[in-house]
Amino acid sequence: MPMENDNGPHVGNVVVTAEQATKINETDGRLPENRQTGVVSDTGSGSERGEQGVGESAVAVAVPVEESGSISVGELPAPRSSSARVPFTNLSQIDADLALARTLQEQERAYMMLTMNSEISDYGSWETGSYVYDEDEFDDPENEDEDDDEDEYETDDDPQEDGLDVNVHANEDDQEDDGNSDIEEVAYTDDEAYARALQEAEERDMAARLSALSGLANRVVEDLEDESHTSQDAWDEMDPDELSYEELLALGDIVGTESRGLSADTIASLPSKRYKEGDNQNGTNESCVICRLDYEDDEDLILLPCKHSYHSECINNWLKINKVCPVCSAEVSTSTSGQS
């Protein structure tokens, strides 16, 4: 749009790029029109302006144009920062840092405003009690109409049901209060009666618990009896010959040991003799096999039916456990001992 200056001539703004300005400056001297009008191109100044101002990108440049339409003589005017928009990549380091800082500050300010607005809205909803969980928010939109219809029918019955529930709970509370009040009245009249009432109540509770536990105990006893029968059957079916050494030891611990020795009377009825040094007749040894000690002269020994002699104390303890001879394993029977 043409503008009027103070000097008089009208000047217009023409947008040209750096390359176009360079070409214009190079070709202005060659055009016959410029030769007639006396226009001289300044190629060096135009190229310097293009390199310093914008580089390779396009920049809007205001060029004064006279009414005749020809470009005035002289250098191109410098671009104004207010009307020019330079890309971020073409800025210097300081300008780029400043632009980035401003952008981050604007983003932070916008984020703070959004946060403050959300907190204010949350505070308002908390004051109004809008934090109640609403299941309708997560339901399907198709079921909203059906839910609304059901709510309309249910709203009429809810007050009555709530009233009945309140009455039931109130009656129960009244009964409990009456029972407690009776006990408290007794407590006010006589402490001993109050203590007895409490003791009777505890006894009734304990009896109820014991009756419940007795039923469980009976079931446990029945289960144990069944298990004992099954375990006895398992022992009856077990063959000791097929057991391992560890199983035999465990069986011995469970069953116990059976005494296979002689009675004290039978042991006392065994014959005795006096040892004579150098007397080795009838299988008499010079030492006791049980204690490994030599016999002394004129020492009393116990003589078994198999003609093996031992110290009386040693053989007595042995025969209490086992009724066989330690040397030949011959059984020491009652009849044999009586005959000898």
UniProtKB/Swiss-Prot annotation:
A zinc finger (RING-type) spans 288-329. Auto-ubiquitinated. GO terms for molecular function: ubiquitin-protein transferase activity; zinc ion binding. It is an enzyme of class 2 (transferase). Residues 133-164, 173-182 have a biased composition (Acidic residues). Residues 1-56, 133-182 are annotated as: Disordered. The keyword Calcium does not apply. One of its GO terms (biological process) is protein autoubiquitination. This is E3 ubiquitin ligase BIG BROTHER-related. The gene is BBR.
